[in-house]
Amino acid sequence: FHAALDAGIHVGAASGRGATRVPQVFGGDKACCRTLLAANGMQVYLDDELVHEATIDRDALLAIADVTRGMEGCGLICFDGPQALVVTGRVEDLRKSFRIYAKTACAVSDVPEFPVVKANVFTPVDLERTQQVIEVLRREVPQVDYSLPMPGFINTTPHGWSKASAVDVLAERLGISPDQVVVFGDSGNDLEMLRHVPNSVAVANATPEAKAAARWHIGECADDAVAHAIAAIARGEWPFTE
């Protein structure tokens, strides 16, 4: 990232995490988070400035709470900064799906009154069951879009909003065209972004859907394939061939 920043390239994470939780991914290096798409594009930062923030309608969250309340092993969490608030379901079940969030989670009696930027649904850690819950939510609460980053966990965004929308906000702010953007992805919450951006890249360990959505393909995250690609771009090279 620092090589790209030194070359005058804006680079940052496009993460499902809220903005307050992204720096820990980079060992606390805030320079790597100055430009950022957080909470699945609900928060857009450019050079440390929050240039866009979306929220999820409270009535929609109340409806999701009603749906999940009757589902065994499932629940709704809303975030207050880094704090996960368990609206429905049990912290013990959240721990099975997302241990980091469960560490500091606390149960609350209702959907928060404050504007909610990030909310998730947790389910049993089983891909088929997670997909079943998504189908129920899409039918019962269609004003929200749902994506599947991993079994046991579901992302929520307002209908029609995704990381792709956030990329457009950032590109417009930078005054660049879509073909001047490169995005990397590996899972269900990256699909819209991978389909939308002409130079989209999937890593080798990506889901089949993410690979199919991407224009370019590189090695695995474990081999630092993304870092190598970014370093090459910083040197003025084009590292994508297939």
Where are these regions (language model features)?
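Hydrophobic/aromatic beta-strand patches that form the interior of the parallel beta-sheet core
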Residues: 12, 37, 182-184, 201, ...
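Short, structured coil segments at secondary-structure junctions
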Residues: 31-32, 40, 140-142, 196-197, ...
